[in-house]
From Swiss-Prot:
Gene assigned in the entry: folD
Organism per entry: Mycobacterium bovis (strain ATCC BAA-935 / AF2122/97)
Pfam families tied to this protein: THF_DHG_CYH (PF00763), THF_DHG_CYH_C (PF02882)
Keyword Iron-sulfur on entry: no
Name of the protein: Bifunctional protein FolD
Family of this protein: Belongs to the tetrahydrofolate dehydrogenase/cyclohydrolase family.
Length: 281
């Protein structure tokens, strides 16, 4: 008997269904939400991701604002583009698509974004608000993970969650979300310095793999019946694969596919953040 699939695409469609009337109400009030993107360079993955975001906007009625820049731009040009979107009244929120070319400082670019227009929830000010528990845009992927677990009635309160990966977009903020009183999980954050990773993952009720190492998590590392969230993506000779080995499906209780699990929800909550920013104005 295999695991139950945590269907991110179906869950995304439910979120879009919720967003459409909210966007229509904002539009009727003259406050149409607008999502902006800044894309530097011609990385195929980044281009596809940005195209997907703007296609999502069209589905729910959000205005698209797109700024595509060549890979060899200067820091000054990038800053001018960020400042322009900060000042643009049609842009409710926006993102700087990562990664940036190596000659540009990603942290400096993210810090230059107006925190009130931070659609990704990754501005240092908003991450600080997450620590404090005060209202702010939430990081999209961690928010999507929590929503997916709740959608399938997977108990979070009191659960032991092992998160593999300490990146700023998933691992670190996910631990903050899961330890809020509203979630009340116990979180173990694992990384390259963790000793005996399998011993920890075998204790977990929920495992989140977010490191980008192909098939890192294998069946012998998972407790029978556990929920497994596959976030990381690696490019191999066989195409794109996740962090979770296929044999985990035979043992776990729930597994998110990759692709088709967390990815669609990351994009859905990007739009949700923009709509919520518009509603708060």
């Amino acid at each position: 008997m295999g695991a139950i699939m945590l269907d991110g695409k179906a869950t995304r469609d439910e979120i879009f269904g919720d967003l459409k009337p909210r966007v229509a109400a904002l539009d009727a009030a003259g406050r149409t939400p607008g999502l902006g993107t800044i894309l530097v360079g011609d990385d195929p993955g980044s281009q596809a991701y940005v195209r997907g975001k703007h296609a999502d906007c069209a589905k729910v009625g959000i205005t698209s604002i797109r700024r595509d820049l060549p890979a060899d731009i200067s820091t000054a040009t990038l800053n001018e583009t960020i400042d322009e979107l900060n000042a643009n009244p049609d842009c409710t929120g926006y993102i700087v698509q990562l990664p940036l070319p190596k000659h540009l400082d990603e942290n400096a670019a993210l810090e230059r974004v107006d925190p009130a227009k931070d659609a990704d929830g990754l501005h240092p000010t908003n991450l600080g608000r997450l620590v404090l528990g005060t209202p702010a845009p939430l990081p999209c992927t961690p928010r999507g993970i929590v929503h997916l677990l709740r959608r399938y009635d997977i108990s979070i309160a009191g659960a032991h969650v092992v998160v593999i990966g300490r990146g700023v977009t998933v691992g670190r903020p996910l631990g903050l979300l899961l330890t809020r009183r509203s979630e009340n999980a116990t979180v173990t954050l694992c990384h390259t310095g963790t000793r005996d990773l399998p011993a920890l993952t075998r204790q977990a009720d929920i495992v989140v793999a977010a490191v980008g190492v192909a098939h890192l998590l294998t069946a012998d590392m998972v407790r029978p019946g556990a929920a497994v969230i596959d976030v990381g993506v690696s490019r191999t000779d066989d195409g794109l694969v996740g962090d979770v080995h296929p044999d985990v499906w035979e043992l776990a209780g729930h597994v998110s596919p990759n692709p088709g699990g967390v990815g669609p929800l990351t994009r859905a909550f990007l739009l949700t953040n923009v709509v919520e920013l518009a509603e708060r104005r």
